From Swiss-Prot:
Upper lineage: Bacteria, Pseudomonadati, Pseudomonadota, Gammaproteobacteria, Enterobacterales
Family: Belongs to the YejK family.
Subcellular location: Cytoplasm, Nucleoid
InterPro entries (alphabetical): Nucleoid_associated_NdpA
Top-rank taxon, per record: Bacteria
Database matches in Pfam families: NA37 (PF04245)
Name of this chain's protein: Nucleoid-associated protein YPTS_1390
CC per GO annotation: bacterial nucleoid; cytoplasm
UniProt organism field: Yersinia pseudotuberculosis serotype IB (strain PB1/+)
Key words of the record: Cytoplasm
GO MF terms, alphabetically ordered: double-stranded DNA binding; single-stranded RNA binding
Keyword Cytoplasm attached: yes
Length: 334
């Protein structure tokens, strides 16, 4: 992995009681060695694989102003990280899910792009066996479960300040959303809405097929082509590029897909990240609620599965063998 660490600082937040969150600050940057490089490579890998939200700094963002000073050389990276950790403590202490942890600030390069990653990592306990086969306790950073993480694409931020996607952060699931907490700490606003972009793409595909008056099977085959490209991009960690997608799709009528979507005003970006859950709707129907979960291929609609909109009734002809076996055994036990 071509990841080059420029500067890295570690500090710590210690929760003394329900109202007190203390700060322990390092007096020097963390020396870069093989252990540090391995840790950052793992954190970069884990973060890159997770679903993220996008944002941009508010005009009055203190962290953005401090970062600009650091980038210009008016303030060194260690001082920047120490002051930011203090603001982080003040913000985090407002929320009920506040816990201690190791606060990490790392400025690094990956594939010619400069990043600043900020994270609060939990420390976990485990057991180890030494060479004498004795047991002892050990502590480790729980990188795989890190959920308080934000990353700033410094290259994008400095070369394209109007961008709405140079800042990314993870969406948490405890108490008030961790994403809300990071918005407050960073003084940032939500930027590119990835799910909205993917929903817009699906709508554009359906409208394009309808405009060409494709039949049911032709329409589903077209959706499958769109899904195949998007899924490949998702698996490769790449974005959906409308121009490339349009080149891979058969042209319907006088306009290709990119021309059609631009003229119809779907407000799609030239490229945007793929959203797995939204894209799945191209080939499947799925839903759950009230103790019921249903998932089936879109091709089965009106073939083996029928929906009556008037009565909101779904009729299934031919049940899966394992389901049928369970139903028969339950019926036989009555």
């Amino acid at each position: 992995m071509s990841l080059d660490i420029d500067q890295i600082a570690l500090h710590q937040l210690i929760k003394r009681d329900e109202q007190t969150l203390d700060v322990v600050l390092r007096d020097s940057l963390l020396p870069t060695n093989a252990v540090v490089e391995e840790m950052m490579a793992e954190l970069h890998r884990v973060y890159s694989a997770k679903s993220k939200a996008y944002g941009l700094f508010n005009e009055q963002s203190e962290l953005a102003d401090a970062l600009k000073r650091s980038r210009k050389g008016d303030e060194d990276f260690l001082s920047f990280s120490r002051a930011a950790t203090g603001r982080l403590r003040d913000e985090l202490a407002k929320y009920p899910f506040a816990e201690g942890g190791v606060v990490l600030f790392c400025q690094y390069r990956y594939l010619a792009v400069e990043y600043l990653l900020i994270s609060v990592l939990s420390s976990c306990h485990s057991m180890r066996v030494n060479e004498q086969l004795d047991l002892s306790t050990t502590h480790y950073l729980d990188i795989n479960r890190a959920d308080i993480v934000a990353r700033i694409d410094l290259t994008e931020w400095e070369t394209n300040p109007e961008s709405t996607r140079y800042l990314t952060f993870l969406k948490g699931r405890v108490g008030r959303k961790v994403s809300d907490f990071f918005m407050d700490f960073l003084s940032a606003a939500e930027g590119l809405d990835t799910k909205a972009q993917n929903r817009g793409l699906l709508q554009a595909v359906d409208d394009y097929c309808a405009d060409a008056e494709l039949g049911k099977n032709e329409r589903q085959a077209y959706r499958q082509q769109v899904y195949s490209y998007c899924n490949e991009q998702l698996r490769a960690g790449e974005e959906i590029a409308l121009q490339v997608l349009a080149q891979e799709l058969p042209k319907l009528g006088e306009k290709d897909f990119q021309q059609f979507s631009a003229e119809q005003g779907y407000a799609l970006e030239e490229s945007f990240p793929a959203d797995r859950g939204t894209l799945r709707q191209l080939t499947k129907f799925a839903g759950s609620g009230g103790g019921l979960s249903i998932n089936f291929d879109a091709l089965l609609l009106d073939e083996r599965i029928f929906w009556d909109a008037a009565t909101d009734t779904l009729t299934i002809k031919g049940t899966p063998p394992n389901l049928r076996d369970q139903l028969q055994r339950r019926a036989g036990s009555k």
